[in-house]
Regions:
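Hydrophobic alpha-helical connector segments
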Residues: 69, 73, 83-111, 162, ...
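Amphipathic alpha-helical packing segments from all-alpha helical-bundle domains
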Residues: 76-79, 126-153, 163-167
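Basic, helix-initiating cap at the start of DNA-binding domains
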Residues: 1-35, 40-51, 65-68
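Short secondary-structure transition hinges
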Residues: 102-144
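C-terminal peripheral helix-coil segments that are non-catalytic and often amphipathic
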Residues: 1-9, 98, 105, 109, ...
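Short hydrophobic/aromatic patch on the recognition helix
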Residues: 49-60
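Conserved hydrophobic residue
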Residues: 38, 156-157
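Amphipathic alpha-helical segments enriched in hydrophobic/aromatic and basic residues
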Residues: 32, 41-42, 53, 63, ...
């Protein structure tokens, strides 16, 4: 899992014209940021962009399909930032600390810098869109990779099953990944990453 991939099942129909699809997504992002995701219909979007509703349906089968693409772009931005931070160190314990810190900071910044776009993130989390499922699976895989490195280096214990350990850490991290949960934890984001990662690292000591 070295590359960040776009989930193949995100609905996209019609001509493989990436420029037009990108144009629709960019215009939709701007429109949603002004008027909100829930209040916007495909007809509203078509009128704002200057395309016909039927033309948009050649590329996306629903409003959710457009929302998923916007969601993918946002999650890719967060994930890229985290992976860059993790790649800067060879020490597994430090990688875990950065996982907690950067995921929290990047999610907070991206999800709440635009309250209208937050609607998309909230819908994605509430309805468990495939883009979110794929993102969560990649986060768990990244945790497993770091845990495996730590076990090989002797930094982490080896008795607990790897997948069980990764899931437990993911559940600790999840309130700072999921926008629905993060909105209720914003007052702890200054201290939580350091405190939680320290607690996790103590539990991983061999």
């Amino acid at each position: 899992m070295k590359n960040i991939s776009t989930p193949s099942a995100v609905p996209a129909r019609g001509p493989a014209d990436h420029e037009v699809r990108d144009q629709i997504v960019a215009a939709a992002t701007e429109h949603f940021s002004r008027y909100g995701y829930e209040k916007t219909t495909v007809s509203d979007l078509a009128k704002a962009i200057g395309f016909s509703k039927a033309y948009i349906y050649k590329f996306f089968e629903s409003k959710q399909a457009i929302g998923e693409m916007i969601c993918i772009n946002c999650l890719r931005e967060i994930e890229s930032e985290v992976r860059a931070a993790v790649a800067e160190t060879d020490l597994p314990p430090e990688k875990l600390r950065r996982i907690f810190k950067v995921f929290t900071d990047a999610s907070l910044r991206l999800f709440f810098r635009d309250r209208k776009l937050y609607d998309i993130a909230a819908s994605a989390a509430t309805e468990n869109w495939q883009a979110v499922q794929a993102y969560e699976a990649r986060v768990q895989q990244l945790l497993q990779e770091i845990l495996q490195e730590g076990r090989q280096s002797g930094d982490f214990e080896r008795k607990t099953p790897l997948d069980e350990t990764a899931m437990a850490i993911y559940l600790v991290l999840r309130p700072y990944l999921n926008p629905l949960l993060l909105q209720y934890n914003r007052d702890t984001t200054d201290v939580a990453p350091a405190q939680l990662s320290s607690l996790v690292l103590r539990s991983l000591s061999p």
